[in-house]
């Protein structure tokens, strides 16, 4: 049986708090059962890109959300979910744009998790 793929949404794959937390979990999970794939909001490669790819994870790059690209951003997510029915779970670590993409994910039947790291 193939591993369940969970889509993790972050801003960048830098060595920040949320990113490091996710990577610590990712390194220790049984990736034959659960596999993390990532959506990031930058065209640039950062600290964890190579490690994620070496662990079998995919990285998808989205535009950074702002009010001026609201409708384009929504189209990107709709297109993504239409083209990737393999994802059943999305775990968002972004507070600002989660209100845009989580309802779209829900529309496509995904289980949604919104995780805030702001203290």
Where are these regions (language model features)?
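Active-site proximal beta-strand in glycosyltransferases
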Residues: 6, 89, 105-119
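N-terminal strand-loop element at the rim of the active site
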Residues: 8-16, 20-72
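Gram-negative host-targeted secretion-system effectors, predominantly Type III and Type IV
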Residues: 35, 39, 102-103, 107-109
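Short, charged helix-to-loop "capping" segments that act as catalytic/coupling loops
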Residues: 40-44, 84-87, 96-97
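A generic structural signal for secondary-structure junctions
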Residues: 57, 82-85, 117
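An amphipathic, basic-hydrophobic alpha-helix
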Residues: 64-89, 99-107
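Short His-centered aromatic/hydrophobic patch
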Residues: 92-98, 116
């Amino acid at each position: 049986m193939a591993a369940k793929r969970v889509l993790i949404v972050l801003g960048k794959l830098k060595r920040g708090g949320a990113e490091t937390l996710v990577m610590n979990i990712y390194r220790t999970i049984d990736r034959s059962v659960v596999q993390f794939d990532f959506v990031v909001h930058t065209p640039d490669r950062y600290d964890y890109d190579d490690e994620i790819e070496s662990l079998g994870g995919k990285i998808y790059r989205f535009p950074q959300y702002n009010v001026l690209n609201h409708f384009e951003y929504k189209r990107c997510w709709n297109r993504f979910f239409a083209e990737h029915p393999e994802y059943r779970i999305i775990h968002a670590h972004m507070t600002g744009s989660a209100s845009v993409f989580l309802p779209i994910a829900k529309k496509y039947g995904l289980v949604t998790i919104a995780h805030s790291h702001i203290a």
